[in-house]
Amino acid sequence: MSDSEKLNLDSIIGRLLEVQGSRPGKNVQLTENEIRGLCLKSREIFLSQPILLELEAPLKICGDIHGQYYDLLRLFEYGGFPPESNYLFLGDYVDRGKQSLETICLLLAYKIKYPENFFLLRGNHECASINRIYGFYDECKRRYNIKLWKTFTDXFNXLPIAAIVDEKIFCCHGGLSPDLQSMEQIRRIMRPTDVPDQGLLCDLLWSDPDKDVQGWGENDRGVSFTFGAEVVAKFLHKHDLDLICRAHQVVEDGYEFFAKRQLVTLFSAPNYCGEFDNAGAMMSVDETLMCSFQILKPADKNKGKYGQFSGLNPGGRPITPPRNSAKAKK
């Protein structure tokens, strides 16, 4: 039996999208074999494509989703369901939210169906030691079994780490690394791989910008570093880039600039965990590399679910809890 016979993608995507318009929280229970098939086939595609993706605009870039499946559906309603728009997601698909399984399954299904138009980077939560603690393991165990969680781990270990859009926009989940001198260093990272506790791969998934730091600083998460505006400016100049686009931190308006608009943080899970009153955002990059932001307001708030937003509100920036915090978030 061929892969396409084993994996009825259109049926899988159809069932995942059937709950659009239902009360948020309604589950979609794919079969275990279907999910295993999604993991195996997507892993094959990830490994066949570069670890440092070279992408072309136009595309839409999204930050953390964290199992907020109904908000992911709203993002697609707003931005256009694939293949209407090209997408790059910056990682953190699982953990914290209630529906990590639906979230990751839809994303993997779209990756398989549109491999040249739909791209997923690895976040720090696409790592067994993290999603063992923050919810994904428990969701897999409750709804399926631990073996399936291990199958997801195999797929996550093959995800690409960074992307460059039209040679000008550098994208990753976390941020820069003091070890990063050449893009070739990223290309040399061998997959499949776990996320180490330190070094280049760790930093790309874990580091954070900090306006109060000059150069490199300690990170409150207990892992990786923080970096200042000058680090950003030097990196962009050295590599002839215009912008760093990253995720990894809750920001009040769904997007937030840093270092004179040389770096932008995107966060795409509105009303994160039901605890923050943040908006979610995605960044549209057009053919001329002009960036605009589409905003998802917290669903239960304002009458308008969507809004175009161009102003800035620096706001406070709550950070996701540190890696070495052993408390799972229920």
From Swiss-Prot:
It holds the Pfam family Metallophos. Its main location: cytoplasm. The modification N6-acetyllysine is found at residue 305. One of its GO terms (cellular component) is nucleus. CDD domains: MPP_PP1_PPKL. Its cofactor is Mn(2+). Its EC number is 3.1.3.16. Mn(2+) 2 binds at residues 64, 92, 124, 173, 248. GO terms for biological process: cell division; circadian regulation of gene expression; entrainment of circadian clock by photoperiod; glycogen metabolic process; negative regulation of transcription elongation by RNA polymerase II; positive regulation of transcription elongation by RNA polymerase II; protein dephosphorylation; regulation of circadian rhythm. The modification Phosphotyrosine is found at residue 306. The modification Phosphoserine is found at residues 2, 22, 325. It catalyses: O-phospho-L-seryl-[protein] + H2O = L-seryl-[protein] + phosphate; O-phospho-L-threonyl-[protein] + H2O = L-threonyl-[protein] + phosphate. The modification Phosphothreonine is found at residue 320. The active site is at 125 (proton donor). The modification N-acetylserine is found at residue 2. PP1 comprises a catalytic subunit, PPP1CA, PPP1CB or PPP1CC, which is folded into its native form by inhibitor 2 and glycogen synthetase kinase 3, and then complexed to one or several targeting or regulatory subunits. PPP1R12A, PPP1R12B and PPP1R12C mediate binding to myosin. PPP1R3A (in skeletal muscle), PPP1R3B (in liver), PPP1R3C, PPP1R3D and PPP1R3F (in brain) mediate binding to glycogen. Interacts with PPP1R15A and PPP1R15B; the interactions mediate binding to EIF2S1. Part of a complex containing PPP1R15B, PP1 and NCK1/2. Interacts with PPP1R9A, PPP1R9B and PPP1R7. Interacts with YLPM1. Belongs to the PPP phosphatase family. PP-1 subfamily. This is Serine/threonine-protein phosphatase PP1-alpha catalytic subunit. The gene is PPP1CA.
